[in-house]
Swiss-Prot record:
HAMAP family: Ribosomal_bL9 (MF_00503). It comes from Blochmanniella pennsylvanica (strain BPEN). GO terms for molecular function: rRNA binding; structural constituent of ribosome. Pfam families: Ribosomal_L9_C, Ribosomal_L9_N. Binds to the 23S rRNA. Belongs to the bacterial ribosomal protein bL9 family. This is Large ribosomal subunit protein bL9. InterPro entries: Ribosomal_bL9, Ribosomal_bL9/RNase_H1_N, Ribosomal_bL9_bac/chp, Ribosomal_bL9_C, Ribosomal_bL9_C_sf, Ribosomal_bL9_N, Ribosomal_bL9_N_sf.
Length: 153
């Protein structure tokens, strides 16, 4: 049975590949799990049209992500004020959510906490300057300095 793969499947092929598999494997596993569809002329045309649309959306998302990275790189650094005690230790900590909120406010781009890559995968607990990586899109990263200052009450 000839099918079109809708997902990457080990030892079978990559997304979009036309492969021949046993009919039971296709009918009982691949097609019900939406991992493949029958390779009819109509389905091939539909799949190719969807692929073209997805490629154009991916190119648009890539250019938007590059613009976002350039904007964040132009910022250079952001400042976050927090209450601290003796020797610069913070009362609490600064996490990825706080940094994402500050970057979103400064740049205008919606940055989520999952895009923030903190050093040592930990929260920031002392006053100082930290270099933070931001994962914007597939292979597009941006770097920004986060300056944590003492909040004077």
């Amino acid at each position: 049975m000839k099918i079109i793969l809708l997902d990457n499947i080990d030892k079978l092929g990559n997304k979009g590949s036309e492969v021949v598999v046993r009919s039971g494997y296709a009918r009982n596993f691949l097609i019900p799990k939406s991992k493949a569809m029958l390779a009819t002329k109509k389905n091939i045309e539909i799949f190719k049209a969807q692929q073209l649309e997805l490629q154009s959306k991916a190119i648009e998302a890539q250019t938007q992500a590059e613009f976002c990275a350039k904007t964040i790189n132009r910022l250079g650094s952001i400042t976050i004020k927090a209450k601290s005690g003796v020797e610069g230790k913070l009362f609490g900590s600064i996490g990825s959510r706080d940094i994402a909120t500050a970057i979103t406010a400064a740049s205008g781009f919606n940055i989520s906490k999952s895009q923030i890559r903190l050093p040592n995968h930990d929260v920031l607990r002392t006053i100082g300057t930290y270099s933070i990586n931001i994962h914007i899109y597939n292979d597009i990263f941006s770097k920004i300095n986060v300056i944590i200052l003492d909040e004077i009450v």
